[in-house]
Amino acid sequence: MSFWPFGQNLNHSNINKILDEYFHVLHELERINPSVGKAIPAIFNNVQERGTSDSLDSIPEEYSHGDEVKTARGDQKSRFEKDDQQERYEKEEEERSMNSSESSTTSFSSGSTSKTDLDEEDISNATAPMMVTTKNLDNSFIERMLVETELLNELSRQNKTLLDFICFGFFFDKKTNKKVNNMEYLVDQLMECISKIKTATTVDLNNLIDYQEQQQLDDSSQEDVYVESDTEQEEEKEDDNNSNNKKRRKRGSSSFGNDDINNNDDDDDANEDDESAYLTKATIISEIFSLDIWLISESLVKNQSYLNKIWSIINQPNFNSENSPLVPIFLKINQNLLLTRQDQYLNFIRTERSFVDDMLKHVDISLLMDFFLKIISTDKIESPTGIIELVYDQNLISKCLSFLNNKESPADIQACVGDFLKALIAISANAPLDDISIGPNSLTRQLASPESIAKLVDIMINQRGAALNTTVSIVIELIRKNNSDYDQVNLLTTTIKTHPPSNRDPIYLGYLLRKFSNHLSDFFQIILDIENDANIPLHENQLHEKFKPLGFERFKVVELIAELLHCSNMGLMNSKRAERIARRRDKVRSQLSHHLQDALNDLSIEEKEQLKTKHSPTRDTDHDLKNNNGKIDNDNNDNDDESDYGDEIDESFEIPYINMKQNIKLRTDPTVGDLFKIKLYDTRIVSKIMELFLTHPWNNFWHNVIFDIIQQIFNGRMDFSYNSFLVLSLFNLKSSYQFMTDIVISDEKGTDVSRFSPVIRDPNFDFKITTDFILRGYQDSYKFYELRKMNLGYMGHIVLIAEEVVKFSKLYKVELISPDIQVILQTEEWQYYSEEVLNETRMMYSKILGGGSYIDDGNGNIIPQLPDNTTVLTPNGDASNNNEILDSDTGSSNGTSGGGQLINVESLEEQLSLSTESDLHNKLREMLINRAQEDVDNKNTENGVFILGPPEDKNSNSNINNTNHNSNNSNNNDNNDNNDNDNDNTRNYNEDADNDNDYDHE
């Protein structure tokens, strides 16, 4: 016995008494009715071998077979034995009388009641001799057990007798007199209670108090009364012997925490209370089934009918939303079975022909879709379970894509489908990151197949709207999680012999990139259509400026282009041999699946046994593999030529790299990576979106995705790739048109003209990233600052893009790439900006917030050094060098050298002041003024013009006199300072005179 005083409620728990009553009745029936004695071993002995440990993590104790049933309670050796039935009966009667004196509860067919609730009739009925029949062994025992507050706690404590009662106990139906197992009864009661819950919204789950907590708090309601099932109510109407039990049930309070339902209450209130009671009863049963106890879960999974009934909860009408009370009931049971009895539960799942349909029918319930992903994630490479093949055969991917239809599915449903597919792609990444990862599989392979990609492209172009947004997110996730640069097996170094093709191979994205490249002009048209749509209403921002909203469609299209550009820079996308190997492996993989299907068909036909031995599909497959091995080995090792796919790229080039010969060579049978860059070059998308960059100065997401595109172009390969031509189009769009061979520049008849305007009419004809983007952005932001005292929102990304241009010009010899690029970078405007304006901006952005500078700590680390406003004096009276105030810009010392002099407070305040945008703006303004003045002076000097100055203005002279008159007082107050200044001026004058004399002397 435990001496722990808390967490126990032995006075109000009647579990042991109910068990004693049940086994007493069972013992009497066994003694009287031989048929019952035959049924007992069948129920209690047909179990798997049980271990001797009390923990149910191991197999429970073994029950003996034959004529005796061993007990698992305490130190008892047997629950009942046929050899000493009478002795056991007397012992049980003695224990029963002791329990009756302590708790004053002895009824065999109802729960315990308090001493004050019993009347003389109850006591006489309880103590009178009982004629035991099969009707006494009814469902009242299991019903009384369900209302016990300590039921779940006792099960969690692994009360073996209680577990045996739940899992192996039975009773006799009063109508049919047939035996009903307690587990079967609980499952049926669960389904009955669920069917009585008419609406999912009538019960607020957030306000539903836990059953155990409510029973412990409700001290006034301790009587064991339960919600009767319809079957039990009909049985009690027919059975007069149980009238006392029925009387006590009517007298008690609600068994599941409901208030007393008076006969005078309205029908609506009664229905609501009944519905809440049904829900609570279903919750209790689901809690029993979801306990992590081997015996309970084993009893469920070994019976197919139990699992079918539990699974049918998903098809209930009220299982229709995230807030439905049936969702947690269904998930608690099934998740526990998946966790504790995975093999048996997955065997059941594989028998469900409508598994995918059942799940997708509730795709808007995120908890259920998470459970769906958990089931799929059990099929790993090292331990396959066949679930992926199951959902693949049930067309999971194609059914998910069918939801991406604006006419048939609302936006929220499409978003849920997109989230599910993105989660599926995440756990199927080619580089596993956690335990839930399952690696590439047939599902993601189907999603990246040419058929699925064609459907996705069609959805984006024709559906647009919510379907476009969701589909773009799916494609972006597919590219990010299947980057071939992180493949665990390099496709270029594999052969069919060393790495036979399988559905677990890395996903090849070449088909995806080629399809999107061919439709890139259609995606650009989406941007143009929205730009030219006059029906889009204008919005007004906080600055009262009218603007056309960017919209999600344009943003998602450009985000897709940025991700496709990432994809085009992958290693496999720039190899012709990789595409050739991928196609060959796909062909062999499809042949293997056909051979496997043929083998399965042959095994099902007994008449073809001899034919199978002579022409074994396995041998045919091996023969094909041998032939294919030879071909693939040649592809991988000898690099043999195939006209269907072309040779590997020619890495020879001339100087400068950008020329017509190189352009024609790259455009002739390009790699899939270069194909995308060529289409991006010909459609002139980059210059258009950079124009939209400036017209939407406050959309930071838009700026970020465009900066990503520009950064990729400048950091891409400049040799053996079409990326260098993209760089040329950024610096000089006009010069780049000579290499756009796919665009007809002039055609009088108008035939063969592309959907885009000819070059002469193109508004971006003279686009240059230096003048038309960076410098223009600076100028617009400068004007805006003069008006609003704040910069435009894109200035941060403008500076980053300018830094990329400067880095590119220093990293490469641009004259070897294209002389046109060098000419642009050598212009006077750009040189002044990059050396002066950008340098000042860089210095301002690198300053520490709060002032200070960076110093070297002596170990090669650059750390911040804040200015110190104190001066530490050395013993000789001099100020320490460590506390001198240094001007971070000039490097000169503004501190004092002697202890008797004052600190320059103005210099100190300048150091302590924050570096703000205002400081930078003022510096830039001074620089621009000086720059403009220098330009004017230089031109005047060249033209021989001398500026003598404007004539004197009387008004200005009077203003100057007034100003001088007003400042007399302050000048008189500062005589000492003026004298000091005069002395300094005199000293300087004398020094200058000495210098002049020295010069004259020389």
Swiss-Prot record:
Compositionally biased residues, Acidic residues: 220-241, 262-273, 635-645, 991-1002
Polar residues composition-biased segments: 868-885
Localization, UniProt: Cytoplasm
Signal sequence extent: none
GO MF, one example: protein phosphatase regulator activity
Pfam families, per database record: SAPS (PF04499)
Positions with biased composition (Basic and acidic residues): 62-97, 609-626
One cellular component term from this protein's GO annotations in UniProt: cytosol
Ranges of compositional bias, category Low complexity: 98-114, 956-976
Modified residues (Phosphoserine): 58, 255
Annotated spans, Disordered: 51-131, 214-273, 609-645, 868-901, 940-1002
Phosphothreonine sites (modified residues): 613, 618
Additional notes on this entry: Present with 5960 molecules/cell in log phase SD medium.
Descriptive protein name: SIT4-associating protein SAP155
Taxonomic lineage from the root: Eukaryota, Fungi, Dikarya, Ascomycota, Saccharomycotina
Gene expressing this chain: SAP155
